[in-house]
Amino acid sequence: MRLATDPAGSSSGLPQPRRVAVLSVHTSPLAQPGTGDAGGMNVYVLQTSLELARRGVEVEIFTRATSSADQPIVSVAPGVVVRNVVAGPFEGLDKNDLPTQLCAFTAGVLRAEATHEPGYYDILHSHYWLSGQVGWLAADRWAVPLVHTAHTLAAVKNASLAAGDTPEPPMRAIGEQQVVDEADRLIVNTEHEAQQLVSLHHADPGRIDVVHPGVDLATFTPGDRAAARAALGLDPAARIVAFVGRIQPLKAPDVLLRAAALLPDVHVVIAGGPSGSGMATPDNLVHLAGELGIAERVTFLPPQSRDHLVRVYRAADIVAVPSHNESFGLVAVEAQACGTPVVAAAVGGLPVAVRDGVSGALVHSHEPDAWATTLGEVFAADPSTFGRAAVDHAATFSWAHTVDALLTGYGRAIADHRADNTLQVAARRSGRRFSMRRGVRA
């Protein structure tokens, strides 16, 4: 495994796709991040698709329709369309029930592809294990390589469950193993995630590409803090720590509230909507803030559009990411791009997203007193001293860089797939059996 942007992994000389089919079964790239199942993955799928289209690559994204008002085909931008596939009831279907609808979703994907001429897609990229299950079948049917991004793994999540959170079911871990075995290439966010795939799922390191996610550097920029606070109705003189994301135990907004209770002059802004179980609704957090005696120091905002999210980042002195696990942490990079330092849990990909002691600080605990101590230290050092370094660090994560690396991974997958086809022909001529994903057999 290696960074797909390493000189040895340059896309120069590798075949490049003309058209890519992208699968995102459980959440639409057009959904508002910060609520339900919509989060960083939605942003990743949409932004990489838009950047691919800028390079002349056509992208079709398949997702499950969740409303009768969803149009079958939505044109997002030149070269990017979203296909809303009808699979099961539009509403009221929990993500854990979606495996029952994978046959219906797969049928919808295959029928859509059948409207094109044979060989229309050059590659298929699935996101999350549910999509991987569909992608495994579709890739075999279309005779194209399957590239898969897990985003999260059941074994990792279950090893870092928050109090009140629901463990991932065994069928997910089984499904993830199947997809790891069947995919031609695996895209991961960090080297740490690559090591997890190898240790937990015995993935072949040679089939793994490390591709860091990006940030929209034209949208997320430093700006006037006073103006941002005025727009949000926040005290211009307050010391503000912001939390942005889905309100669910995994994201641990309760840890931030408990830490704030130990910092008498800190105001907390929480921007996000409900997701998951346990301490998973704004109402529950409102109740917790009341119990802690800090209700008057906490402001709750609904999920924000990108333009409004920029104001939240700019308004904050610090953005907190106390998650129990993050495969990367796009919120951390977006905040730093706005010149706001980040205090984050030292888990998953966050040590890559945040430069400890330079663009923010990492906390090696989820205990409120440890968080209060680190937040206090950053305030004492003056958060603005981290601002320039935060912007510089975020500048290394652009969607252009991400897609450069992604195209390298795609090129490797296509080249290997073509080589397999050559071996398949040779094997047939010699009377030997051949599996596209297992090689020549006696």
UniProtKB/Swiss-Prot annotation:
User: Binding of UDP-N-acetyl-alpha-D-glucosamine: at which residues?
Assistant: 32-33, 40, 246, 251, 304, 326, 334
Entry EC number(s): 2.4.1.250
What residues does 1D-myo-inositol 3-phosphate bind to?
Answer: 26, 37-42, 95, 128, 152, 172
Catalyzes what? 1D-myo-inositol 3-phosphate + UDP-N-acetyl-alpha-D-glucosamine = 1D-myo-inositol 2-acetamido-2-deoxy-alpha-D-glucopyranoside 3-phosphate + UDP + H(+)
Q: Which residues bind Mg(2+)?
A: 313-314, 316, 340
Provide the assembly information. Homodimer.
Name of the protein this chain belongs to: D-inositol 3-phosphate glycosyltransferase
